[in-house]
A protein has these predicted regions:
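Segments of small-molecule ligand-sensing domains
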Residues: 327-333, 344-401
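Immediate post-signal peptide segment of exported/extracytoplasmic ligand-binding proteins
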Residues: 27, 35-58, 86-94, 189-195, ...
Length: 418
């Protein structure tokens, strides 16, 4: 149990780390000159697709300050592809993974995206890495039209209710803050029967995206929100807390990440607020539980969301450890493994000539199960990242402050009884 809790906490830290040339269009179909009575395949395969292999790649920080994240992340991707390749590949093709080291630098990331797509001729991006690089290149990725599976960040630009056209090739897996904000409201209503919800959110992208998601779901459910904004990293949030307290809400969303959430929780306790709080998976770490456990004791509970369930993933963890023995307990390698899995599941579904359009169709054709978590459904252009999340709360784990599991992975529909 202690090992699992430690890994879960480390997975939350992944998000904190992850907190140009002419564009090449997708290959066009070539008209066939074969007589109609002898139909043959006339589609040309997409770039990066060969008779015996399919080439994919990414740029990630494998040197510099973020190398401890980027190196195992890519190792996880490579381990998954090695497993697939040694079993014969996908439809007779091995998966070849190429990589550029962008050092977490958005300028280098833009240049390396150009190299990967136009020089290396990759079929798809797998594991586009880091908030600054993804933020700087997301429009370029869309302009190329290349499929991009798994982003090591949760920025709001990845979210789309119905992706079409140039937006369609974006396939996020990690939680996106906008989706998480919606799930927080679904938990508040479904689990805690809240009718009036307070939201304290920071004025940075994370806080605004969480609040945006909460607003959308509250409007859909006809639930009242009372919201107060605070400065990210603020040391005094007393005014916002007083407003929420006086509004007599049923439940509170702490839409802030590590630098601010302890201040919010401590001030709620100081003002003797007795309403439970829920916060983002990014905060589900020992550092946060240790910071607030003494202040909240007996006053209210602090809950956090999560996107993996290692306690019920023993077989998947054993398979991961077999193929990535040097990284068997490394959470960054686990996320790379997840990235490799999602790409491969889409590829397995493609029939006939492998094109970008067919691959996108394949990813949208049915939900895909996270080997360590819930399912993600890309149907009808849904690009929401993780859509099933579990629940834990601050408490004692092995006589130390930690996060105690409360409820398993559930979708918003399940939480709301739909």
């Amino acid at each position: 149990m202690k090992k699992i809790v430690s890994i879960l906490a480390s997975l939350a830290i992944v998000a904190s780390f992850a907190a140009c040339g002419s564009k090449t269009p997708a290959p066009a179909e070539t008209p066939s000159e074969t007589p109609a009575e002898t139909p043959v395949e006339t589609e040309k395969p997409a770039q990066g697709v060969y008779d015996d292999k399919i080439v994919v790649g990414n740029s990630a920080a494998t040197s510099g300050n973020y190398a401890p994240v980027g190196v195992p992340f890519n190792a996880g991707i490579e381990a998954y592809f090695k497993m697939i390749n040694e079993a014969g590949g996908v439809n007779g093709r091995k998966i070849e993974f190429v990589h550029q080291d962008d050092e977490f630098d958005p300028v280098k990331g833009k240049a390396m995206l150009n190299t990967l797509v136009e020089d290396e001729k990759i079929f798809a991006l797998v594991g586009h890495f880091g908030t600054p690089v993804v933020g700087a290149t997301i429009e370029d990725v869309k302009d190329y039209g290349i499929p991009a599976v798994y982003f090591a960040t949760g920025i709001g630009q990845l979210y789309n209710d119905k992706a079409t056209g140039r937006d369609r090739g974006i396939f996020p897996v990690q939680p996106i803050y906008k989706t998480e904000g919606q799930i927080m409201v679904a938990r508040a209503v479904g689990d805690f029967k809240a009718k009036k919800i307070g939201v304290i959110y920071t004025n940075d992208d994370a806080g605004k995206d969480l609040f945006s998601g909460a607003q959308a779901k509250a409007k859909e459910l006809n639930v009242e929100l009372v919201a107060e904004q605070v400065t990210a990293g603020a040391t005094d949030v007393s005014s916002a807390v007083t407003t929420i307290k006086n509004a007599n809400v049923d439940f509170i969303i702490g839409a802030a990440i590590q630098a601010t959430i302890p201040t919010i929780v401590k001030e709620l306790a100081a003002q003797n607020v007795n309403k439970d709080v829920i916060t983002t998976y990014v905060n589900v770490s020992p550092v946060i539980s240790q910071a607030v456990i003494n202040e909240i004791n007996g006053k209210f509970d602090v809950y956090g969301l999560g996107w993996v369930d290692l306690a019920t993933s023993a077989d998947a963890l054993a398979e991961f450890a077999k193929w990535a023995p040097d990284y068997a307990t490394n959470v960054y390698a686990m996320t790379g493994w997840i990235a490799g899995h999602f790409f491969t599941e889409g590829l397995k579904r493609v029939e006939g000539t492998v094109t970008w359009e067919k691959y996108m169709d394949a990813l949208e054709s049915a939900p895909i199960k996270n080997p360590f978590g819930g399912v993600i459904d890309y149907k009808d252009g849904k690009r929401a990242g993780t859509q099933e999340m579990n629940l834990s709360k601050v408490g004692l784990v092995n006589n130390a402050a930690g996060w105690v599991p409360v409820d398993g992975l559930k979708s918003m529909d399940v939480l709301l009884g739909k």
